Amino acid sequence: MAQPELDLSKAPAHWGMNFTETTHQQPSRSIDPSNVTFPQGYTVVVIGAGKGIGEHIAKAYVQARAENIIITSRTGSDLDRVKKELETLAQQTGQAVKVSTLVQDATKPESYTKLKDLLEEGFNGRLDTLVFCAGGGPVGTLWTPRIDETDVDEWNESIALNFTGSYYAAKYLVPLMLRPQSQGKTIVNITSAASHFTGGNITPASYSIGKLALNRFTQILGENYADQGLVVVAVHPGSSPTPGALGSMPPSLHNILTDDQGLCGAVCVWISKKKREWISGRYICATWDMDELESKKEEIVKEDKLKWRMAV
């Protein structure tokens, strides 16, 4: 079946693509990570940093002079490459940055116990910001709009990669984040605007469902630990020509891949650099103007916006 082109500028209002009047395809000056300096010892974990959005998120935290960066991926060669690039970038900031790597299958709980051990042994159990960026667009049978034609194993893998791993990350790593030495207490879950979609010929159902579950989990996690200062935000990273997107999306949908891969990283740093309890449990788009978003703070909190609910 031919895939239709997708024009996000004509998206329904409830998708929230234009929640701020101003939108961006590249980081604006006000969220430039290079203008940020995190406190001494600041420790960041980026799960799924071997390429694409995750790689650029890690780069943004290096630009912001986070002292410790731990990156994970399934592929060791990707981690080796990204580590070298991060270390080169760190030299340009004039601040020493320790980059550590862990080969990890984000769908397996034992991967997170290993990550916890790494943080305990190498970083005094400190974890300030956790970015869950594992995920990916489905391939194979999952692009069919007919559920009966999908492969069960491909379906389960897609859900595990785009959602279940975030549960494992929270279960094993949140206890570290609640310790006194972990000052940032921030989780960013990389979601997708696809969580709004229901048409299987535009985005696979398993991907939409996985990201929708991630959004609700973000809200639940934020509410669970609000009294302990944990801030949890779901971020749509924009639509970027990442290796994953280009490799999984039909060519007819490549027209929407126009956002800079570094945009999401800049927004993640913006979330981390200051306590923003008012956006905890909510969904935001990296393409939004963050100054405009902050100006809507009272409206967002009063009307409890940017959360999933049923229209009745």
UniProtKB/Swiss-Prot annotation:
Induction line: Expression is significantly up-regulated at the end of late growth phase, in the presence of Butyrolactone I. Expression is positively regulated by the pgm cluster-specific transcription factor pgmR.
A GO molecular-function annotation: oxidoreductase activity, acting on the CH-OH group of donors, NAD or NADP as acceptor
Keywords: NADP, Oxidoreductase
Superkingdom assignment: Eukaryota
Main EC class the enzyme belongs to: oxidoreductase
The EC number(s) this enzyme carries: 1.1.1.-
Active-site residue list: Y207, K211
Annotated metabolic or biological route of this protein: Pigment biosynthesis; Secondary metabolite biosynthesis
Protein name: Short chain dehydrogenase pgmD
Organism: Aspergillus terreus
